[in-house]
Amino acid sequence: MKPAKQTTASLAFLAMGIVYGDIGTSPLYAFKEVFFSHHPLAINPDNVLGILSLVFWAFVLIVSIKYLLLVTRADQNGEGGILTLSAIAQQSAPKPWQRIAMLLGILATGFFFGEAVITPAMSVLSAVEGIAVAQPDLAPYVLPIAMMIIVALFAVQAMGTERIGRFFAPVMLLWFLVLALLGAHAIWHAPQVLRALNPAYAVHFVLLYGQHTLFILGLVVLSVTGVEALYADMGHFGIKPIRIAWFALVMPSLLLNYFGQGAYLLTLSAPTGSTFFSLAPKAWLWPLILLATFATVIASQAVISGIFSLARQAINYGYLPPMKIAHTSEHSQGQIYVPAANMLLFVAVIFVMLRFRSSANLAAAYGIAVTAIMMISSLLLVLVARYQWQWRWPRVVTIGIVFIGMDSLLLASTSTKLMEGGWLPLLLGCVVFIVMYIWQQQRQRLLEIAGNELSVSAMIQSLEEESFQRAAGTAVYLSRSLNHVPRSLLHNIKYNKTLHERNVLMTFQYEAVPRVHPCRRAEIEQVSASFWQVVIHIGYQEEPDMAQVMHCCGLKGLYLHPNETLFLLSSERLKVQKLGMWHDLKVWFFIQMSKHALRTSERLNIPPDRLIEMGVYREM
């Protein structure tokens, strides 16, 4: 039992460096924005205790109960994430709800990208702004320094972060201990802030401000940004270590710091705007700024890695066109680099920093995408609870009312900042949603067109009855589906008048599981004397590789010798069939994405000297 405990403890330690980076750096700006934003709340005991009570119960209800106890129950072989939750809902829900679950998953993915643009800018700026607290003369240099850090962060992505990644957990452990120490020291001088643990203070605050509470709740949301990382990174560490890290260290440290900032406001007659950095003695200020900068870089890295992982998931689910994906580690499958996503995210982050220029201005843009994702996760959770877990309606309705009601309130509160910057992540999210929706819809249409063509069995029977010249070796034809005759096969017969001794119709089927066991990788059926049908199963966290595929086929008895196997692919050129402006625009956009998508031969790592590509035209 002891080794198991050590393993769980070490995973909990590592989880601090990845999972809790975003939510762990929220004390830098969340509390400050309530009392020192463009629309500050008056500093008095009722307001301070009310806000602290709201933060505490947000941690309990949203993070601890909703995510760590409920949402994380919905997993596929231990993997989590919003697309996983959407996939589980689609598997079990009635047909009308399946498409809704798919669209909700795509929409949440778009909002995650919108949030990912704000997070690095907000986190790094809020840390570097500590320089202006230590040395006010350096205030004009805050933005350039923050931008230099962001440029360096995105520049190293191509090299991978495996070497420096080992320092993430120790740095974040030190960060959380410092948070706790600073907060506890301040609470010692004003222990009355601990009364905010009583929910009566939150209720009193809401009753006191009435409808104006919505505006203030939008700032309280900043304390739980990054909560979706708990679910998304579940596959890397397991839910038990993530829960241990939260309840044993992360949550107590964050609450101590927030309550310490509240104590600071109540004990000083003229508190300054930077409530976090003001907790530290002057001698600690520069080391604290340096530590905060490291912590925000780690938080930003976790978000960037999350975007790479989500992009790969979306590609394998068929929601995004194939892109180049590079593996940056020989030891970890999760260490990947997606150049296109990296460049788009970098440009967007730099634009946001230049547009908003400070964490105070960015606070208005931060939060609305987070609450939108929370709302979607609650809607999907209700579907999963009813149809996957088979919960009875009274239980489902209860969690629906509690969490959808709570998320609706938070979404409404962040919507009050829509015109001050909240439009930006929503706009980015909607753009990503439209791209994914058009790609998925038109790709599905192509599969339907292919399925309506000549049947595979009839075609094979016809070919076996004909007397074609036979070429030596094996020809592999890639097919969209089992019922689809590859265009490359038809063109080879039409123009070359030849067949190979062995012909393999190969289909790649992406499964709603993170990884497929090697024993289940290949399904092989010999359908005639010289034809085989092969289905290759790929998980959404995997990258297809033809060398591995050939090895798996060999294990099942179909030997594909590299020097005797030829791969014949059809390179489609799509044409628009004029049916109306909206239809034509969608098809045109799909065609443009197809032109710039990663070629099948490149994605599968097919050797160029064993490849023949044939151009074909298809009308949509």
UniProtKB/Swiss-Prot annotation:
Q: Name one GO biological process term.
A: potassium ion transport
Q: Name one GO molecular function term.
A: symporter activity
Its membrane topology is listed as:
Multi-pass membrane protein
Q: Give the principal location in a single coarse category.
A: membrane
Q: Name one GO cellular component term.
A: membrane
Q: Does the keyword Disulfide bond apply?
A: no
Which residue windows are transmembrane per the record? 11-31, 51-71, 100-120, 138-158, 167-187, 202-222, 246-266, 288-308, 334-354, 364-384, 396-416, 418-438
Reaction it catalyzes: K(+)(in) + H(+)(in) = K(+)(out) + H(+)(out)
Does this entry carry the keyword Ion transport? yes
Q: List the disulfide bonds.
A: none
Q: Which UniProt keywords apply?
A: Cell inner membrane, Cell membrane, Ion transport, Membrane, Potassium, Potassium transport, Symport, Transmembrane, Transmembrane helix, Transport
Enumerate the InterPro entries for this protein.
K+_transporter, K_trans_C, K_trans_N, Kup
Location comes to:
Cell inner membrane
Its biological function?
Transport of potassium into the cell. Likely operates as a K(+):H(+) symporter.
Q: Which family does it belong to?
A: Belongs to the HAK/KUP transporter (TC 2.A.72) family.
Q: What is this protein called?
A: Probable potassium transport system protein Kup
From which source organism is this entry?
Answer: Vibrio cholerae serotype O1 (strain ATCC 39315 / El Tor Inaba N16961)
The lineage, from the top, is: Bacteria, Pseudomonadati, Pseudomonadota, Gammaproteobacteria, Vibrionales
Report which gene this protein is encoded by: kup
